[in-house]
């Protein structure tokens, strides 16, 4: 889980790099702009360019990460993982970076806002602290509002959902069954409720119990379910579209503010100076 979490966290410095490049091009565009293009051309072109570069980099990262890890080389799951990580996640963090940039008065404040919101999304996405241990206030507010919650859930379940779990010898828990009972009879109800498996269900001395029998049990225990995959995919698109709307609305408001507060020329003084 933390490997996937760290792969997602790589976007933090990339967000600031995107903001720096886009701010430079925005300043250049505004100095040289002759009203030949609609005002929305600048932010939309920045998104297209940055997303294309991000997808190329994410594809290389995906090839190095996914197949060398060899957790799940199923072609369908590999395609799902690529779609969520190399396409959707790149769309999200690029539009997030540019949206926060246009929402902020300058690049320095944009860096502060981006870092603050990023910290909230990361801390309460279920990786640093499991869902069951998150305080109720944060569980039902920031947890469900964090985009990382849905990216992490999809990528975790895509890798582990259909994989069996085989415990090493030092990973089994040792239990003593009640007198006259086999391990299978003693642990039957608990395994039915919590999952896991016994190394030998017929023994009556020591029960060797593994906490999980499948990757699905592991992800379900973290409040992550593969059945939510396409629902989460739709939520990802909602975040991306929301970022684009924020970006365009913020830039338009900035242009309106500048036009209303633009200093007016003194026509009278100009006329007098020309006559003289």
Please report, for each region that a protein language model flagged, where it lies by residue.
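Membrane-spanning alpha-helical segments of multipass transporters and channels
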Residues: 1-276
């Amino acid at each position: 889980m933390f490997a996937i979490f760290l792969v997602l966290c790589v976007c933090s410095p990339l967000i600031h790099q995107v903001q720096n490049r886009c701010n430079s091009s925005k300043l250049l565009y505004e100095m040289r702009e002759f009203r030949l293009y609609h005002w929305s051309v600048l932010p939309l072109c920045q998104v297209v360019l940055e997303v294309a570069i991000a997808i190329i980099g994410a594809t290389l990262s995906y090839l190095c990460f996914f197949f060398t890890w060899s957790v799940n080389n199923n072609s369908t799951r590999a395609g799902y993982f690529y779609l969520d990580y190399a396409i959707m996640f790149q769309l999200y963090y690029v539009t997030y970076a540019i949206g926060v940039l246009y929402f902020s008065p300058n690049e320095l404040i944009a860096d502060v806002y981006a870092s603050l919101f990023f910290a909230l999304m990361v801390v309460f996405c279920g990786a640093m602290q499991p869902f069951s241990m998150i305080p109720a206030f944060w569980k039902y507010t920031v947890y469900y509002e964090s985009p990382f919650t849905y990216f992490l859930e999809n990528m975790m379940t895509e890798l582990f959902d259909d994989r069996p779990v085989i415990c090493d010898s030092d990973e089994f828990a040792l239990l003593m069954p009640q007198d006259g009972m086999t391990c299978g009879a003693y642990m039957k109800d608990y395994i039915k409720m919590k999952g896991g498996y016994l190394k030998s269900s017929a023994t009556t001395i020591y029960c060797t119990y593994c906490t999980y029998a499948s990757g699905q049990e592991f992800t379900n225990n973290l409040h992550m379910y593969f059945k939510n995959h396409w629902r989460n995919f739709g939520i990802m698109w909602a975040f991306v579209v929301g970022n684009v709307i924020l970006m365009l609305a913020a830039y338009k408001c900035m242009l309106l503010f500048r036009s209303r507060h633009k200093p007016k020329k003194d026509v009278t003084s100009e006329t007098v100076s020309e006559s003289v």
